[in-house]
Amino acid sequence: MLVRLVITILLPRPVTNWLYNKTRKVYASWYPTPDKQHHDRKQINRIRTAADFGDLCSIWGYEFEEHVMLTKDGYLLGLHRLCTPKGAQRTSIGMQANKPVVYLHHGLLMNSEVWVCLTSPDRALPFVLVDLGFDVWLGNNRGNKYSKKSIKYDPNSKEFWNYSIDDFAWHDIPDSISYILDLTKAKDLSYVGFSQGSAQAFAALSIHPQLNQKVNVFVALAPAMSPEGLAAPIVDGLMKASYVKFSIPRRPDSSPYQTHPHVPRFRP
């Protein structure tokens, strides 16, 4: 202790001042000031009480568009779009942005809000991408907060809710992508999926070969592919066979699935 004190006393004043300022910055980064803590709590409360996607965007000063598209089987899905960087002049709704297009899709039991409900815009991928010059779209599965309508069924009927992840892959993903490309006039887009949003894309790209021409990059964040506890020994054995040919039957309300001439080998 005495040695440290002597060394500190003997150090030149500029050196001690420099060390003092550095330690203050380190301390401030680890222990926020009361003003910053109050500001952070205020932002957290605003996020917690936000009613919808629009409220979450307005917290950070971003403009957005809301679109509704119709799937081939009659469901109305909500799409959200961010095409104007923060502080830039807003373009007319639905107008071509002439920018590279990115499509983000949420995970299980979520909606598009999951991408923008963070405590800093620097941590929200859609905000980062739109500021970098991308035309950002966020999708929603049928049945969630933004997709509870259909031209065929009443949302309160059993028929409306009679769907599964197969319908997400067969209709929701490809139809959403087609709507976006038709509106933006873009040739293709980049797909970012989170959890089940990745699984839906894997399935959609498999059963719709033409969809692969519309997706230039597929990014799977925390992809959900094989949930634990749902193992089926017979199916597992078939999938691990050396050569397996699959012919999936036609759905009554859709065009036939593609019959794949071969499936890559799966190793145990």
Q: What is each PLM-predicted segment?
A:
Residues 106, 126-131, 169, 177-181, ...:
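Amphipathic alpha-helical interaction motifs in eukaryotic regulatory proteins
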Residues 14-70, 80-86:
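An N-terminal hydrophobic leader/cap segment in hydrolases
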